[in-house]
């Protein structure tokens, strides 16, 4: 029965409860200057929101399932209901989805957004470092996820950025997710507590010791652990090529590859 549990990508239409964290706390304003709030117009014309994070002055990383027809990124924001003096609102020039992204399995759920102009680095806006290709998170390590998604399965959203502690779990905890792939995904959660990224948090970072190691991808509809994040380390060579403007048509990342 557990294998039949409803799984969902954690993107949410705006107006239906978008952006926040379950079981977490409000972040200190602008203490996570890399956080990005994405306002998306989908291919069908609907409005949706996702999270993301600044990895260079002109590139934001997010989940591939957050791709839309048009996207505007807001940096330096804590309360999305207000126009804060720290905000930088920049339109997306290009969406670069990983060439092996699979909508049905959520594998390779990673995308880079090239901004129309470079962000200005300020105390409220800055980049976050990425891991080395050989880095691999070990079970038991404590990290944090952040976002503006729902605070509960039936609760409304909060306008302010929130964050939650997340424990890296053993791959066995995600064995009931049919398409879970340990080489490219991270299994996270707090086994005895409902602490999770949820609807609207998609694309936000999993931060461990100041480094972005994961991207919010999908989880259970009831918000119980575990949730699945895209593992960033095996994609670092691809990320570097995108940022340098190299041709991506011949690049491929095979599911059988090891990230080390």
From Swiss-Prot:
Active site per the UniProt annotation: 65 (charge relay system), 109 (charge relay system), 202 (charge relay system)
Recorded GO CC terms: extracellular space
Record-linked Gene3D superfamilies: Trypsin-like serine proteases (2.40.10.10)
Catalytic activity, as annotated: Preferential cleavage: Phe-|-Xaa > Tyr-|-Xaa > Trp-|-Xaa > Leu-|-Xaa
Domain Peptidase S1: 21-244
Listed GO biological process terms: protein maturation; proteolysis
Predominant localisation class: secreted
Primary enzyme class: hydrolase
Single GO MF descriptor: serine-type endopeptidase activity
A Pfam family assignment: Trypsin
Location within or outside the cell: Secreted; Cytoplasmic granule
Signal peptide residue numbers: 1-18
Residue ranges listed under propeptide: 19-20
Sorted UniProt keywords: Disulfide bond, Hydrolase, Protease, Secreted, Serine protease, Signal, Zymogen
EC number assigned by the record: 3.4.21.39
Disulfide bonds: 50-66, 143-208, 174-187
Main function: Major secreted protease of mast cells with suspected roles in vasoactive peptide generation, extracellular matrix degradation, and regulation of gland secretion. May participate in generating perivascular beta-protein which ultimately aggregates into amyloid-beta deposits.
Family listed: Belongs to the peptidase S1 family. Granzyme subfamily.
Protein name: Mast cell protease 1
């Amino acid at each position: 029965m557990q294998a039949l549990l409803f799984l969902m990508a954690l993107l949410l239409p705006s107006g239906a409860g978008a952006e926040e964290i379950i079981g977490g706390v409000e972040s200190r304003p602008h203490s996570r200057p890399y956080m990005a709030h994405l306002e998306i117009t989908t291919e069908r014309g609907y409005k949706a929101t996702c999270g993301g994070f600044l990895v260079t002055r002109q590139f934001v990383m997010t989940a591939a399932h957050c791709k839309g027809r048009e996207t505007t990124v807001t940096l330096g924001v804590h309360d999305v209901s207000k126009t804060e003096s720290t905000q930088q609102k920049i339109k997306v020039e290009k969406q670069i989805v990983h060439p092996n992204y699979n909508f049905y399995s959520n594998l390779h759920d990673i995308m880079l957004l090239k901004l129309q102009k470079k962000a200005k680095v300020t105390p409220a806006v800055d980049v976050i470092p990425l891991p080395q290709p050989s880095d691999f998170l070990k079970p038991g390590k404590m990290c944090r996820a952040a976002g503006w998604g729902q605070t509960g399965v039936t609760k409304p959203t909060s306008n302010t950025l929130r964050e939650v502690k997340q424990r890296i779990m053993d791959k066995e905890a995600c064995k009931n997710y049919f398409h879970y792939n340990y080489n490219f995904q991270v299994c996270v959660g707090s086994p005895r507590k409902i602490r999770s990224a949820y609807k609207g948090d998609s694309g936000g970072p999993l931060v461990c010791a100041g480094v972005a190691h994961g991207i919010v991808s999908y989880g259970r509809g009831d918000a119980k652990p575990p949730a699945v994040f895209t593992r960033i380390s095996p994609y670092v060579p691809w990320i570097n090529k995108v940022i340098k403007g190299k041709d991506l048509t011949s690049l491929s990342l095979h599911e059988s590859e090891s990230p080390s």
